[in-house]
């Protein structure tokens, strides 16, 4: 990877105060390298500039780290090329991650790169529709969607995969109405416990993370 990638990754991690050690950074670089290599043959991401990939895929995935203290399992729904699940596994190698997506070629990449990097990540080629037993998906301490669907569509599905005491996350490309998030959670017996708004440090793109827990 080029110097622009390293600078974007380091500046993003430092600006947002994320707990990412040198070993994790090395894994993140290897993941990004394999992602771009596979992307030449398989459509995994529209972002191909290394610095932009570092910020908008890696750093933006890692923002969940401070909220995962105590979580042992994570389910990444609509994971695509393993985002945010694989970057989180790079930084939290004690975290058992399941990435699911309905597109088999994307999960083939997830499986291959996770094996190559020796990450605790399982890939499942299935579209999550709220039926974990039928789909072969676990209930997890943290259930995550990254811009998969609007919150009122995501929460009823994601709630089905929560382990007892777990947290449901929605990673959003913008700030949304808090009242709408509260209503979406309440309909599923969940309480909105956080809405954190942040800005990516290089592009200044606005982002938000919503968190719900069982009542």
Swiss-Prot record:
CDD domains linked: AdoMet_MTases
GO molecular function: rRNA (guanine-N7-)-methyltransferase activity
UniProt-listed Enzyme Commission number(s): 2.1.1.170
Catalysed reaction, written as an equation: guanosine(527) in 16S rRNA + S-adenosyl-L-methionine = N(7)-methylguanosine(527) in 16S rRNA + S-adenosyl-L-homocysteine
Record-listed S-adenosyl-L-methionine binding positions: 78, 83, 128-129, 146
Annotated localization: Cytoplasm
This protein's record includes keyword Zinc: no
One Gene Ontology term, aspect cellular component: cytosol
UniProt keyword annotations, A-Z: Cytoplasm, Methyltransferase, rRNA processing, S-adenosyl-L-methionine, Transferase
Functional summary from the UniProt entry: Specifically methylates the N7 position of guanine in position 527 of 16S rRNA.
Name of this chain's protein: Ribosomal RNA small subunit methyltransferase G
Organism from which the protein derives: Anaeromyxobacter dehalogenans (strain 2CP-1 / ATCC BAA-258)
Originating gene: rsmG
């Amino acid at each position: 990877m080029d110097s622009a990638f390293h600078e974007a990754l380091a500046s993003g991690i430092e600006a947002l105060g994320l707990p990412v050690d040198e070993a994790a950074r090395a894994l993140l670089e290897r993941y990004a390298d394999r992602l771009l290599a596979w992307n030449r043959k398989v459509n995994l991401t529209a972002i191909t500039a290394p610095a932009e990939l570092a910020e908008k895929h890696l750093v933006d995935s890692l923002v969940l780290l401070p909220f995962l203290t105590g979580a042992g399992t994570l389910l990444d729904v609509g994971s695509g090329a393993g985002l945010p699940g694989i970057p989180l596994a790079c930084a939290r190698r004690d975290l058992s991650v399941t990435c699911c997506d309905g597109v088999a070629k994307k999960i083939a990449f997830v499986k291959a790169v996770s094996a190559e990097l020796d990450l605790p990540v399982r890939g499942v080629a299935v579209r999550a529709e709220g039926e974990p037993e039928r789909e072969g998906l676990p209930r997890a301490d943290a259930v995550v969607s990254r811009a998969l669907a609007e919150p009122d569509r995501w929460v009823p599905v994601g709630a089905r995969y929560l382990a007892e005491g777990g947290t449901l996350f929605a990673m959003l490309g913008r700030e949304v109405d808090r009242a709408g998030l509260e209503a979406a959670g309440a309909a599923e017996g969940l309480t909105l416990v956080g809405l954190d708004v942040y800005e990516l440090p290089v592009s200044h793109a606005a982002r938000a993370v919503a968190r719900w827990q069982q009542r």
